[in-house]
């Protein structure tokens, strides 16, 4: 939970000029950061869904936590909205609800349920988003002028998943260790996501896959495709 809070706090307050996708002046010139933030947001949305639906519920008969319900609703607000209400105000309120849920965890009013089926549900959820990211990275109809949008969106998703899955590996260590190569596969997922984070070309090129000019979307897609494959393996362990 703290990881999700820290990720959103950084995008809302840690960056110079804060949230960019709804900035009608500065945002016009910072599309790389805009799309990176959108990627982080989408990963947070997917994670909040799983937190609400399974990770914090004993079973289907258990009630949803109201703070997680409100946080999810607020995270779903349009990222480009700059008034009535602004994206920043909605996301900050969502973060506040996550913080309220953390307090419930500390006082024992709520719990995490580290079951293997919850881990599989989370991994499948992440796999679905990454599959969509993969398709956008290999889309041959993407032009030179917007290829960087897809590149940085994918990096935002990968960054959020890297930070969250580092925590998941610790929390689900017992469940992963009980399956053959479970921990090794999770470590490899983290390694591939780290590779994505380390890709930072000065200019995003969009050459042909068999051309002499680089295609950075395709380069980014390689480790992300491996992550999707490894997530399929984890979900079947």
Which residues does each predicted region cover?
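N-terminal Sec/ER secretory leader and immediately downstream segment
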Residues: 1-87
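A cross-kingdom feature marking solvent-exposed beta-strand/loop segments within repeated
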Residues: 21-32, 144-148, 202-218
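Extracellular/lumenal glycan-associated surfaces
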Residues: 40-49, 156-167, 226-230
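Structured alpha-helical bundle/scaffold domains in large eukaryotic membrane-trafficking regulators
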Residues: 56-63, 138, 173-180, 201, ...
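Charged/polar, low-hydrophobicity segments characteristic of intrinsically disordered regions
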Residues: 76-89, 191-209
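Extended amphipathic alpha-helical interaction segments
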Residues: 88-190, 194-198
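C-terminal accessory extensions/subdomains outside the catalytic/core fold
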Residues: 192, 199-237
């Amino acid at each position: 939970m703290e990881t999700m809070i820290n990720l959103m706090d950084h995008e809302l307050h840690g960056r110079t000029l804060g949230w960019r996708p709804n900035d009608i002046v500065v945002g016009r010139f910072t599309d790389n950061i805009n799309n990176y933030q959108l990627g982080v947001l989408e990963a947070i949305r997917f994670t909040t869904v799983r937190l609400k639906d399974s990770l914090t519920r004993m079973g289907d008969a258990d009630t949803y936590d109201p703070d997680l319900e409100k946080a999810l609703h607020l995270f779903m607000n349009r990222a480009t909205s700059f008034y009535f209400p602004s994206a920043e105000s909605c996301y900050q309120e969502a973060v506040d609800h996550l913080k309220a849920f953390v307090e419930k965890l500390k006082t024992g009013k709520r719990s995490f349920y580290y079951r293997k089926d919850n881990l599989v549900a989370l991994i499948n959820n992440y796999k679905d988003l990454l599959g969509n990211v993969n398709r956008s990275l290999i889309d041959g109809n993407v032009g030179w002028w917007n290829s960087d949008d897809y590149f940085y969106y994918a990096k935002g998703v990968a960054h959020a998943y890297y930070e969250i899955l580092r925590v998941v590996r610790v929390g689900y260590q017992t469940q992963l260790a009980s399956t053959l190569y479970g921990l090794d596969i999770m470590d490899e997922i983290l390694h591939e996501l780290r590779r994505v984070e380390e890709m930072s070309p000065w200019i995003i090129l969009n050459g042909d896959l068999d051309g002499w000019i680089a295609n950075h979307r395709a380069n980014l897609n390689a480790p992300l495709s491996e992550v999707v494959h490894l997530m399929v393996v984890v979900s079947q362990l």
